[in-house]
């Protein structure tokens, strides 16, 4: 039976109820292999090295370096186009070092400029240990995909960026996601048209941001080619679904972009209120990690073991 969404350059796709099998003629990335193995991949967002370590130790296979979350954690600022590509690369390098077994995919916003800027950015992300990137078609300065006031560049302009990114990636183990924010300003059909154009330009997967309901999600799945991404934001425009539900709808990668930063913010606000009101936390220790739990999280004992190797130096006898 012919695949419902056709074939792509370099691979044959077979899609049934969200499953995906790629027969590669050259490149197959870590993310491709995860999707083949699991059908759909749940990818929590991370904002820093600590959150990445938590995600890895919890047993996830992939993580998403969320620009929204990094902007908040690093700068204390909203996702309003204020984060630079240099800061994104810096955050990514720390995250991949803290969680070396995760397949780390990065929110690349608009790529830092034109096609040549995109190519430099891609090479720096690869050097920083990333395994993939999202590149979106918003006008710069961009905004969070679930905020008001978004605008998009001409589709052909973003397609050139995707083509440039594909060239920069070459044979690297790096997964390219083309994101479109056209749903809000121009409607779902335009978002779908752009997604397919960007797939043709060289994207491994496409991401139509902020479908408003299940019917729109199903329409995206039915009308877009190749691998598809869904983004779950608590309180956002798209209703929350499980990976199994998304697999049935025909989505392959599910990002929970802001779960970690929202949970961190709530916990921090709550404990700071207690400390301000009571002047102590002695009756509320259950709201925090213990000293030993936290030390285990950051692998303290492994550092003691490494330290012990270098306590004494004995020169060779001559």
From Swiss-Prot:
Prosegment location in residue numbers: 1-3
Co-factor binding comment: Binds 1 Mg(2+) ion per subunit. Can bind other divalent cations such as Mn(2+), Fe(2+) and Co(2+).
Give the protein's cofactors: Mg(2+); Mn(2+); Fe(2+); Co(2+)
How activity varies with pH is as follows: Optimum pH is 7.0.
Consequence the record notes for mutating residue 79 to A: Reduces catalytic efficiency 1000-fold
Tissue occurrence: Accumulates in senescing flower petals.
**Catalytic activity, as annotated:** oxaloacetate + H2O = oxalate + acetate + H(+)
Q: Which InterPro entries match?
A: ICL/PEPM, Isocitrate_lyase_ph_CS, Pyrv/PenolPyrv_kinase-like_dom, Pyrv_kinase-like_dom_sf
**Record's note on what induces expression:** By ethylene.
Which Pfam families does the entry link to?
Answer: PEP_mutase (PF13714)
Per UniProt, the keywords (alphabetical) are: Hydrolase, Lyase, Magnesium, Metal-binding, Transferase
Q: What is its EC number?
A: 3.7.1.1, 4.1.3.-
Q: List residues binding Mg(2+).
A: 107, 109, 142
Transmembrane stretches in the record are: none
* Binding partners and assembly: Homodimer and homotetramer formed by a dimer of homodimer.
Its biological purpose: Catalyzes cleavage of the C(2)-C(3) bond in oxaloacetate and in (2R)-alkyl malate derivatives to form oxalate and acetate, and alkyl carboxylates and R-ketocarboxylates, respectively.
Q: Which family does it belong to?
A: Belongs to the isocitrate lyase/PEP mutase superfamily.
Q: What is this protein called?
A: Petal death protein
Instruction: Identify the species of origin.
Output: Dianthus caryophyllus (Carnation)
Organism taxonomic ancestry = Eukaryota, Viridiplantae, Streptophyta, Embryophyta, Tracheophyta
Q: Which gene encodes it?
A: PDP
């Amino acid at each position: 039976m012919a695949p419902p969404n056709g074939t792509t350059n370099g691979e044959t796709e077979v899609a049934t109820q969200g499953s995906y099998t790629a027969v590669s003629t050259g490149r197959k990335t870590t993310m491709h292999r995860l999707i083949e193995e699991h059908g759909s991949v749940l990818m929590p967002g991370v904002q820093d090295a600590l959150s990445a370590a938590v995600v890895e130790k919890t047993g996830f296979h992939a993580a998403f370096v969320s620009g929204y979350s990094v902007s908040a954690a690093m700068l204390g600022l909203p996702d309003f186009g204020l984060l630079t590509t240099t800061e994104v690369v810096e955050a990514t390098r720390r995250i991949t070092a803290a969680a070396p077994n995760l397949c780390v995919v990065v929110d690349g916003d608009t790529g830092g400029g034109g096609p040549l800027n995109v190519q430099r950015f891609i090479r720096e992300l690869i050097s920083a240990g990333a395994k993939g990137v999202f590149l979106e078609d918003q006008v710069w300065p961009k905004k969070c995909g679930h905020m008001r006031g978004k605008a998009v560049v001409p589709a052909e302009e973003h397609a050139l960026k995707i083509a440039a990114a594909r060239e920069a990636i070459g044979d690297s183990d790096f997964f390219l996601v083309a994101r479109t924010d056209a749903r809000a300003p121009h409607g779902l059909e335009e978002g779908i048209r752009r997604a397919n154009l960007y797939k043709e330009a060289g994207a491994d997967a496409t991401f139509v941001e902020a479908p408003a309901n299940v019917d729109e999600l199903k329409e995206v799945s039915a009308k877009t080619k190749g691998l598809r991404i869904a983004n779950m934001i608590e309180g956002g425009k798209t209703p929350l679904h499980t990976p199994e539900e998304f697999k049935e709808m025909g989505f392959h990668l599910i990002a929970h972009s802001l779960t970690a930063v929202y949970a961190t913010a709530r916990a921090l606000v709550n404990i700071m209120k207690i400390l301000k009101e009571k002047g102590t936390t002695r009756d509320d220790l259950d709201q925090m990690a213990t000293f030993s739990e936290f030390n285990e999280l950051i692998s303290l004992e492994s550092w003691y073991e490494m330290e012990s190797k270098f306590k004494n130096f004995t020169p060779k006898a001559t």
